[in-house]
């Protein structure tokens, strides 16, 4: 008797049973798909690579995938299993496979391009390029370029991830071909020469070699490198002091060296804190908004710094806010897209609310994913001690209610 957790496989292949169907081998010597049919609920797509890159037609791969494919049906649907159309499932599967195999777009083994039947397909393209004596693994998908002597492969998952281009011939952009060529410092295109690789299995091990220039030129890694160099200098200074202590032994020099080590540790903490603050400001530069009510003073949209005088004669109320864009909305609201200054505590009222000529209003939170993402991030940073409790973040500013309104007269006063 079958338990409730067991899966009842529904065969959607051809009319013959799997044991009676002869294994149809794909004529593509490069991509040999073998579907493991030992278990009904598991399908393992095994790629076996050969030395050549001659690939067969699409119908062979579709025929093999359809002939040895089972779709598991839950046991609780056993009463209506006869209502499930095997033919419709087979047609749907075949149409999806045909669409995957006939599409010109390069499909990668990721969750974005995965079909409804959990097939991770990456089809090779027929290529008649002249291959060298090296044996290439079919883990990489080679496609023919406009030049017959080059075969390139580019994989770009997102815009923020570097795209890698592999070529089997000399790079026309550079006179001398090397194992790793960073073509442009502004772009993230990296070329790796396949001829220098002895075995294709060593390609994942070489990731650190051609990722090193990208990580080195990344703006977020420069602060970490400066911090590491500063720590090395502090270690050298402390080692020099200990050598002096050994030559001229004195109690005061040991005391000063311990004081210096404490100072260097504190300086490293300050350095890391400054780098973290720089990262936070660079990441939150696009979400910083400050909303003002339109004052009586005429504002010049071309001005770079907004300077207003308060009732006490103080100037530059928006100190530390370098405003580049002024946007005038309806109902006389003025919003600035600003970049904060490191030496200015943002949204800290220096005067009472009623004495400010420009009153910043705190709006209600927008029910969008960006607000909740920033709110959760700031909560986690406060919990981890990365963000001080005295500084008000962007999400906390929007989340907190408006300040209390001070009436000149009692609100309960009724005029007759």
From Swiss-Prot:
Positions in coiled-coil regions: none
InterPro entries: PB1A10.08
Keywords per UniProt: Cytoplasm
Compartments in which it is found: Cytoplasm
Superkingdom of source: Eukaryota
A GO term from the CC aspect: cytosol
Main location: cytoplasm
Primary role: May have a role in meiosis and sporulation.
Stated name of the protein: Meiotically up-regulated protein PB1A10.08
Organism expressing this protein natively: Schizosaccharomyces pombe (strain 972 / ATCC 24843)
């Amino acid at each position: 008797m079958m338990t409730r957790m067991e899966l009842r496989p529904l065969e959607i292949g051809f009319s013959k049973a799997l044991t009676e169907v002869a294994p149809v081998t794909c004529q593509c010597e490069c991509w040999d798909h073998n579907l493991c049919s030992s278990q009904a609920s598991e399908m393992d797509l095994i790629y076996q690579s050969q030395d050549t890159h001659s690939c067969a037609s699409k119908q062979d791969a579709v025929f093999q995938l359809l002939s040895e494919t089972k779709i598991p049906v839950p046991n609780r649907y056993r009463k209506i299993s006869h209502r499930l159309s095997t033919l419709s499932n087979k047609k749907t599967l075949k149409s999806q496979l045909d669409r995957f195999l006939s599409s010109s777009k390069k499909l990668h083994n990721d969750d974005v391009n995965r079909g409804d039947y959990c097939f991770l397909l990456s089809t090779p393209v027929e290529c008649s390029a002249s291959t060298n004596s090296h044996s290439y693994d079919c883990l990489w998908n080679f496609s023919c370029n406009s030049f017959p002597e080059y075969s390139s492969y580019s994989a770009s998952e997102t815009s923020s991830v570097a795209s890698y281009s592999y070529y089997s011939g000399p790079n026309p952009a550079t006179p001398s071909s090397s194992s790793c060529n960073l073509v442009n410092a502004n772009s993230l295109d990296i070329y790796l020469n396949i001829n220098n690789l002895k075995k294709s299995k060593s390609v994942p091990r070489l990731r650190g070699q051609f990722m090193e220039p990208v990580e080195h030129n990344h703006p977020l890694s420069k602060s970490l490198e400066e911090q590491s160099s500063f720590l090395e200098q502090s270690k050298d200074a402390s080692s020099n002091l200990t050598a002096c202590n050994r030559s001229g032994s004195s109690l005061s020099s040991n005391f000063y060296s311990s004081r210096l080590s404490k100072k260097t540790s504190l300086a490293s903490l300050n350095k890391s804190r400054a780098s973290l603050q720089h990262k936070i400001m660079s990441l939150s530069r696009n979400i910083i908004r400050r909303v003002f009510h339109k004052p009586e003073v005429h504002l010049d949209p071309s001005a770079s710094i907004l300077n207003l005088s308060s009732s006490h004669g103080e100037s530059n109320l928006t100190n530390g806010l370098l405003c580049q864009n002024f946007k005038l909305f309806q109902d006389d609201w003025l919003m600035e897209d600003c970049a904060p200054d490191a030496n200015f505590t943002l949204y800290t009222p220096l005067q009472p609310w009623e004495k400010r000529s420009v009153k910043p209003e705190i709006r209600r939170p927008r029910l969008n994913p960006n607000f909740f993402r920033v709110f959760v991030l700031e909560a986690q940073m406060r919990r981890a001690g990365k963000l001080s409790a005295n500084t008000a973040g962007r999400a906390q500013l929007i989340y907190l209610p408006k300040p209390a309104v001070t009436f000149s007269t009692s609100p309960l006063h009724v005029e007759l």
